């Protein structure tokens, strides 16, 4: 049985797919990624690399599994991000028994404040486009939805 989408309305969007959650989520992701990538590119990082670096700088010794859960990324993606950051000399892995722990190097710790500044610059651009309150509410709704979808997997 097909479920009708109550959001379907010619005025709802300029796209005929504007009532599709998958389409809307990807359109939003592309739009904010353009903003985020531009800011983090100044540091030679993608936004995913920047978030991972920030995590291990703020909370040293996390496992790749914990990073995967925190950043909503697959374990294989986390491994690729760690490898790239290792190549840049920004993080290091340390075996501990059967686990592997990830730490920011001294160079990673030095770069972490610039990552935080880029993060703030991105937020300012998002809030300027949407309005502060709408940006806060949208962020909360997106994270809540991501957590629900992750729990359902």
Where do the language-model regions lie?
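N-terminal leader segment of winged-helix/HTH proteins
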Residues: 1-43, 101-103, 110
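C-terminal regulatory/oligomerization modules of transcriptional regulators
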Residues: 1-15, 117, 132-153
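Helix-turn-helix DNA-binding elements, focusing on the entry/boundary residues of the two helices
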Residues: 64
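Central "turn" residue of the DNA-binding helix-turn-helix
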Residues: 60-61, 72
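Residues within the alpha-helical elements of helix-turn-helix
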Residues: 55, 70
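Short alpha-helical elements of helix-turn-helix
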Residues: 19-23, 43-54, 79
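Alpha-helical linker/hinge and terminal dimerization helices associated
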Residues: 28, 32-35, 39, 71, ...
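Charged, amphipathic alpha-helical coiled-coil/dimerization segments
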Residues: 83-143
